[in-house]
Amino acid sequence: MSMSSPDITKKLFGGVLDVDGAGFYPGLELLNFVLCCEEGVLPSQDNFTLTRYAHDFARRLLKDDSLPKDEKRKVLMDQDSEDAIRRLLHCLELDVANIVKTKSWERTHFFPYTRSLIHWDARLKGKNIQIERRYLRGGGALAFHILRKDENSIRLQKIRDGFDLLFPDNEDTPLESLASTLRGRGQKDGSPVKDRIEPESILFNDELEELYRDGMMNILSHIELPRVSRIRSVINWTGIWLVIMQNARSSDALGLERVNLIFDCAGSHGQLRRASQRCLKDSISKVFLAASNVADGKSSKQQLGKVRGAFAATAAAVGLLNSWRGRRHFVMGLDALETMVLACLEGESEISFERFGMDWLYEKCRFVTGRESAQDADLLNNFDSTIFEENERQLAEQMKSTGLLTIYSDATRMISTGALR
């Protein structure tokens, strides 16, 4: 019997990771599970249910010209109201890059600024709206499974409390009221349903899962920051962690030493950029080879390509690659940097820039950015150490310009979230 890409990724990575569900979609799916679960946030029991919302009226209002006028007038008074709401909804759209064609309403998702903007995938089948998986393929189900199965009860409760603060039940803002009204005009499950994919997730009980839980706990602890910063980081951290995890577990499956990811933060050294390009190619190749070994000749190249594509697409979406196509290499985008800082630090704490680069980026995430990490990764045999010193300096400048790094009079460099408040 042939193996599909979901069969392969469940065995290799623990859950369903597909190129069509890559990027920000795992984070969105995670939030759907968190907010739509009838048994509360991150239930310990397996027999939980979900009430899923399609938000089809608002999504069709934004992208579907065939939405009947009489349906629109049941909610919106006139054309002026319709135009105003459509412009607002456009501002709430999740930005999805690398789409050549114009997005249909089925591929249009809202960024979850408030709990009533959360919605599942849906499509128009005949004259009926059908709620189903299209882009929320299972990456978020794996993340949800890892979080709710945490055996550290203190950390689990902190994460639960963090989600409660992020999306309060009693929120009463104009945006929440509007989103709730529009969502109420769309389809939802008539009765709570059980998810089929989440229970099939496999735990490895390793340090990678601990890394994801710790990072999520830290992100949610930053109650001093605007909620949108935390929500964005929850989504980004889920994607970043999936990249870290796929890179590590592919090497493990092949019986090879885990690969360090080389980041070009300076953009001025051709040798470093080429090394980062080779590093990316090697990582993608290992994902493909590991998937091929798992399939053992029982899968098509198309299915194996979906596994490989999920890795690169997620890395590009969360800001870890310089571009979606062409000559690609690892970089640290601004959103990725902010997310990495929030995931590293708990609450209003701080850490030295040197320890952030070595203890967090390198030892925890396997990201090589500076001289010390390059030396530990045995890269200085082939590189002049000044290249990584300049790379580290440029990373520090980038973080300083965004307010994530403060340089004191004694030249001490400290990482914190102070400027984001």
Give residue ranges: language-model regions.
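Eukaryotic partner-binding/assembly regions in large regulatory complexes
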Residues: 99, 108-322
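Intrinsically disordered, low-complexity regions
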Residues: 5-14, 27-32, 54, 58, ...
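C-terminal structured domains
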Residues: 274-421
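Generic recognition of cysteine residues
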Residues: 36-37, 91, 265, 279, ...
